[in-house]
Amino acid sequence: MTDREHLWLRLAVDLVILTVRDGQLQVLVIERANDPYQGRMALPGGFLRAGEDLRQAAERELVEETSLDGAVLHLEQLATYGAPDRDPRGRVVSVAYLAIAPDLPIPTAGSDASRACWAPVEDVRDDLAFDHNQILRDAVERARTRLEFTTLATVFCGPTFTVGDLRHVYEVVWDVTLDPRNFSRKVVQTPGFIEPTGTRRIPPTGRPAALYRRGSAEALHPPILRASPGTDG
Amino acid sequence: MTDREHLWLRLAVDLVILTVRDGQLQVLVIERANDPYQGRMALPGGFLRAGEDLRQAAERELVEETSLDGAVLHLEQLATYGAPDRDPRGRVVSVAYLAIAPDLPIPTAGSDASRACWAPVEDVRDDLAFDHNQILRDAVERARTRLEFTTLATVFCGPTFTVGDLRHVYEVVWDVTLDPRNFSRKVVQTPGFIEPTGTRRIPPTGRPAALYRRGSAEALHPPILRASPGTDG
DNA sequence: CCAATAGTGTCTGTGAGACAGTATCCG
DNA sequence: CGGATACTGTCTCACAGACACTATTGG
């Protein structure tokens, strides 16, 4: 019964990589090639290795799956999931990380045999393996909250972007429509949120928009609060 | 080298139990009786057991250390700490939980040989074993944020409390002074925050104050935002 | 009466939301 | 010129903070 006091287990690190593509919030998923849940969609992840920090493991998985530099991207710990029966192979506790990426040209330059692809969150939110549906739900809610209180929305965009691009991120992630004029005033007035680059982008139609880059601020004071506290299933 | 792919480790669950006592934010700490960091202060915790969920383990530790029912108290997962060298005994990853308790008469009715006691956060914030200083910092910051956006402050109080008691919680946790009149209006007007019991409490001096119990709401709309974004080390 | 705490009413500045109006591109 | 998008100005309402004032106890 010393086993009760000293349970040995394996620790997995799973990734929820979110982006905004084609006007939708999308998540990077893989199709499982092996044993449990074979053929099912799942979040990318892997086991923690010796000598590795949790964040290091998350960054390593991120590179393996998307060829993205985890040290540059936004990457934050989400939560840890440890229900005894969450993995049929045995006791596996999973630390989930939330990553935010701009719209990448091709997601899967990975080396793994498993195919990786972007999928709209709405399309896969109930079809993932393990307890990944719950993890994805928690990740989306975290991202929505981060948009309220931090400058995270700029990470969804590329290195330079217009105020309209930034507004588009908010509208897609929150699933709302925002007044472009009020949003512009709000964002420009918030110190450290965005910095003008001096250049402009000429759209197919309409007046050219000023291009910005992300500012130095991390937190938003005051925050951009959502009107309704998100009551969508 | 299969060891690199399948690292086995032990998972600990550590608790940050906060309360407001004697006008200070205090945390429950134990004095370590055994091997690493013997005699040093540390957060209470223990290893995950077979068949146990993470939250179950946290509730079990909570009962062992404080004889409090973890199912009733506020208990939320804080974060997971997994630096390779965080525990001299070997690879141990720790899932930290944040618990909020009202001012208890005696903290240590626990069975463990280790002595448990309340200590002001300020007094122990740099003297804890392992990486518990960092965990404590994160926990306090989480609690401060929770007070802004949830009705968590009522959990610091007993089953019934006055508006002044509730204000006292905010003032101690945030380390600020609040206008009693504005605070009262704000709290009473927020639907679901507090419910009148119809009874009153007679203080040593002054007008009797109405007693309330916690309301049904969990989230605060709108939130009670701190003025300054906490720049204390 | 005074001291002390509880609670109400009022003013003011700030910011969000609504929306008219102006600016600048393409065709 | 019209169509479309970017951006500015103005109004209104709600709320946070400051603070005068009233209410209710004990001594």
State where each predicted segment sits.
Chain A
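A short catalytic or substrate-binding loop motif that flags glycine-/basic-rich loops and adjacent residues
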Residues: 6-11, 89-93, 204
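N-terminal strand-loop-strand
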Residues: 2-42, 55
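NUDIX/MutT-family hydrolases
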Residues: 96-99, 107-143, 147, 156-164, ...
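Short, solvent-exposed loop/turn elements at beta->coil junctions and helix N-caps
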Residues: 79-86, 199-202
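The catalytic Nudix box helix
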Residues: 48-76, 97, 166
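Core RNA-modification/binding signature centered on pseudouridine synthases
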Residues: 9-10, 16, 28, 33, ...
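Short, P/G- and charge-enriched loop/turn segments at secondary-structure junctions
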Residues: 1-5, 83-86
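Active-site-adjacent beta-strand/loop module that shapes the phosphate/pyrophosphate-binding cleft
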Residues: 23, 83-106, 139-142, 210-219
